[in-house]
Each structure stands twice: as C-alpha cells, then as structure tokens.
C-alpha cells in the first residue's frame, strides 16, 4: 500500500502541522515525513502528536525556512533510519545519518536501522558485573567502569575532558579491539570541528563514528541525535558482538532540547519548566545502553550542571542512571597532574570486594583514606607549616603526595605534544604499585619520580636518572616504624 500524502496546514517555528485525508491511512507516531523544498533540499519531519481530524503535529529536523501552507508532505512509512556498520567508522554524520564530512554518501542498498528501538529484553541482558579495564590508573583503581555501565563526566573548560575521551577511545581500540561512537548533542560547532581534527591527528578516528547535532540546530535534531549515535553503537554490539564506547556530550542538552520540544507541542511544563515526560525520555535512552550476551555499550556522558545545582531535575534525573562519576578538577591541572581526576569526588558503584576483589578494594580504600587525611591536614600545613605535624602525620603527607603524583600518567594521544610515550597500565599492576607506596617501600624516593609514569617500576628507573640511589635497608619499609621513615 502506498504511503499517504498530506499537506502543510501551519508552520510555527520548528513545529509543522500536517493535514492528511481523514479517510486515508494516517502516519504513526515517530514516523518520518518528507517535504520537498523549493530550493531542491528535502526536509524531514517527525510525527509527535495527532491533533484529530487527520492533522498530525510534527517536529522539524532542520530549518523550516521556505515552507508554505499546502506544500505536499510524504509519509515514509517508518521512523528516521540511519546507516550502520563498519563503513560508519571514521565518518561524521548528522541526526538523519547523512555524512557531513564531505565524504561519499551511503547508497540506498546500505543497511539502515531505525533510531526508535526497544531496550534489550531481560533474557538477553548480561547480568554479571564485569570491569572494563581502561589502562588509566586513577579510573581503574578508584572509580572502575562497568562493562555496559554509564559514567558521568564532570569538568569545566580546559581541564582535559577531550584528551581523556581520546585516550579512552585509543585504549579501548588498541587493547580491546573495541569501537567508539562520539555523539555531540547541542554543543558548539567549533568544539566538534576541533575534536574531529584532533582525533584524526592522534589516529583514533578510524575506530570511531561521530554524530553531531550542534547548538545551532533545531530542538528536534538536538533531541534525536543521541538516539542516532546510540543506534550506530547498538549495531556493533548486537550484530558484530563488540564492546562499544558511547560518548554523549552533553546529556544536559538532550534534556534541554526535549524541554523546548515539549513546550512547542503545548504540553504543560513540570518542575523548573522541564517537560513532564523528562524521566520517561531519559529512561528510554539510558535503558538501551547496557550489556547483552553478545556485547556491550558502555556510555560516558558529559554532564553540565546548571548553576552548580545538583538538585536541578535535569542532572538529578541523569544521576539515577549512572554507575560511576569522573570529576575533573582544575586545581589538579594547576599542579600539573594529568589526568586531573579528583580521586575523592569521583566514585563508582563497582568499587566493591565482590566485583573488584578484596585486595583491589582494600588498596583503593586505603588510598582514599590517605588522600582524605592529607586534605584535612592541608589547612594546618598552610598556616603552621610541616614542623607542627607529628611524625605519623608527616608520613601520611609524604605518602599522599607520592600517591597523588602516581595517579598521573602520560597519555598515548598526547605524545605528539609532550614528547613522552603514553602508558597503558593493567589493573593488577596499578593495584601492586599503590600497595607498595602504602606499605612505605618507596618513602625515600623523590616525589618527582612519581610524576607522569605508568607502572611502579618506572618510578625506580626515573629516580635513578635523577641520580637517586635507594638505600638497601629502605627497600622494605614494612619493618620500619612510620616515625623513623618520616625522620629519614
């Protein structure tokens, strides 16, 4: 049966009402409609509401400039569908799956999947909790990511979000053979452009598909672009059996676009002006991000918090879905510690003995305790100086500073800037290194030897290059009293 044809009844900004014959087949909710504009371009509309008498209210995916009443509108017979598969890697798309990188377009025979899909069924889910090793010490030790989990990435401008994202993409591709999908939702076009060229230069673009719906685009495009990126990621999980990293920057803009669309559709707003369907829309997106028996989609979502108000409905609704948070702190960048992840503010639900093991959990909690004690002592140090501390407190400060520096490491994607080779550190090596520092085995080593290194063995090598010769009697500090270690 041919798909029905209607006519534009009215245009209100990005909202277009389309009248179809009452005795004909009406398009379903979420169906894509097309309008041939006079300039030769084609505008896609998505059905949002049925107003009655054959009139459907739709949301435009691009500018409605040039539309007129009574222009013909064709029902495509299905939702927006986007190209999927290995050919999407290294390419950049818009919300409709059209390439925007100047490359070759996909033919009509290429596989396309609908962006509106159900979450995986219960029987298809992988119920085991498995850690996704990133090779980044501070993440793997203190806020481990769950395979198929969701991570919130917090940080202001210039604290290293982009470099951290690039390193995660690099490590997942190199060590796990995984695929990444980057989705830019409602952010600056310039930032997306810069990210594309940076990823191209660092060599990670070939393992990445990129989808953008930037802040200059209509709210319909910004609301649906996250689903476009997720659909591409789901193909690699469900068909290729891959472990996929899905980056969403910024998940707040997804909510913001939904709020705009809701108001345009005439819905009564809820708390603080947000859409009444906020929790439903967020749930429909987040529940598709999960592990199945075939593969996994692990999501890392940059989150903007309006006015730093964590009780705002938009971030508060997102938090309910997160398994871990990674907080980037400007104070650490000022100290030259990269990645600038705050080890005390970041957290993960996976940091339990049942998931990471007893030794990992014990070392991680001891590291947090030492860093917390150091933070408490900093006020005393800044006012009275180190001399007023007890011998035991001096040991805590010394070890905390070494731990803080050892949490930093060089990134592979930053090697062309720093001239230093990057390092991928397995979880076992990370735990071993921090356990040795906590045990006092490296109390005598200079602090600078711990900066931007990978494994603990690199600390020894760096110290030797600095002219440091460790005393044999200090190599096993378990036998020394803490006060004596501080005195040395």
Curated annotation (Swiss-Prot):
Membrane topology: Peripheral membrane protein
Pfam family name, one: ATP-synt_VA_C
Catalytic reaction equation(s): ATP + H2O + 4 H(+)(in) = ADP + phosphate + 5 H(+)(out)
Alphabetical keyword list: ATP synthesis, ATP-binding, Cell membrane, CF(1), Hydrogen ion transport, Ion transport, Membrane, Nucleotide-binding, Translocase, Transport
Enzyme class: translocase
Record's signal peptide: none
Region span, Disordered: 467-488
Record-level GO cellular component terms: plasma membrane; proton-transporting ATP synthase complex
Main location: membrane
Binding site for ATP: 155-162
Protein EC: 7.1.2.2
GO molecular function per UniProt: ATP binding; ATP hydrolysis activity; proton-transporting ATP synthase activity, rotational mechanism
Compartments where found: Cell membrane
Family statement: Belongs to the ATPase alpha/beta chains family.
Protein name per UniProt: ATP synthase subunit beta
Source taxonomy: Bacteria, Bacillati, Bacillota, Bacilli, Lactobacillales
């Amino acid at each position: 049966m041919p798909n029905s044809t209607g006519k534009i009844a009215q245009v209100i900004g990005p909202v277009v009402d389309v009248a179809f014959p009452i005795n004909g087949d009406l398009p379903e909710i979420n169906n894509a409609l097309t309008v041939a504009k006079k300039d030769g371009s084609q505008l896609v509309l998505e059905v949002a509401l049925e107003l009655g008498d054959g009139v459907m209210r739709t949301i435009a995916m691009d500018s409605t400039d040039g539309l007129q009443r009574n222009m013909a509108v064709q029902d495509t017979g299905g939702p927006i569908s986007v190209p999927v598969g290995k050919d999407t890697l290294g390419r950049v798309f818009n919300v409709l799956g059209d390439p925007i990188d100047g490359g070759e377009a996909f033919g009509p025979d290429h596989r396309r999947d609908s962006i509106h899909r159900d979450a995986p069924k219960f029987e298809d889910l992988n119920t085991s909790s498995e850690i996704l090793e990133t090779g980044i010490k501070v993440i793997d030790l203190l806020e481990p990511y769950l395979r198929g989990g969701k991570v919130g990435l917090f940080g202001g401008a210039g604290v290293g979000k982009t470099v951290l994202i690039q390193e995660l993409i690099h490590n997942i591709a190199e060590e796990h053979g995984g695929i990444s999908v980057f989705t830019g939702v409602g952010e600056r076009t310039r930032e997306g452009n810069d990210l594309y060229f940076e990823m191209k230069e660092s060599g990670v673009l070939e393992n990445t598909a990129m989808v953008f719906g930037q802040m200059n685009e209509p709210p319909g495009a910004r609301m649906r672009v996250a689903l476009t990126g997720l659909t591409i990621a789901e193909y690699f999980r469900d068909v290729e059996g891959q472990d996929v990293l899905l980056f969403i920057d910024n998940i707040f803009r997804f909510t913001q676009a939904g709020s705009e669309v809701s108001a345009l559709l005439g819905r009564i707003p809820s708390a603080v002006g947000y859409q009444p369907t906020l929790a439903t829309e967020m749930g429909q997106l987040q529940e598709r991000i999960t592990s199945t028996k075939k593969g996994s989609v692990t999501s890392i979502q940059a989150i903007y918090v309006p006015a730093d108000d964590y009780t705002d409905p938009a971030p508060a609704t997102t938090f309910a879905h997160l398994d871990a948070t990674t907080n980037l702190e400007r104070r650490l960048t000022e100290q030259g510690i990269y990645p600038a992840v705050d080890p005390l503010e970041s957290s993960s639900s996976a940091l339990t003995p049942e998931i990471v093991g007893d030794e990992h959990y014990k070392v991680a909690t001891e590291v947090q305790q030492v860093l917390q004690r150091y933070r408490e002592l900093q006020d005393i140090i800044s006012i009275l100086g180190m001399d007023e501390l007890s011998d035991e407190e001096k040991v805590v400060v010394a070890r905390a500073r070494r731990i803080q520096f050892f949490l930093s490491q060089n990134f592979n994607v930053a090697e062309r800037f720093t001239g230093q080779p990057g390092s991928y550190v397995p979880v076992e090596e990370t735990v071993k290194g921090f356990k040795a520092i906590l045990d006092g085995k490296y109390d005598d080593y200079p602090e600078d030897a711990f900066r931007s290194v990978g494994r603990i063995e690199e600390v020894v090598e760096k110290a030797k290059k600095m002219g440091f010769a460790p005393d044999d009697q200090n190599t096993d500090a378990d036998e020394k009293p803490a006060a004596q270690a501080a005195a040395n």
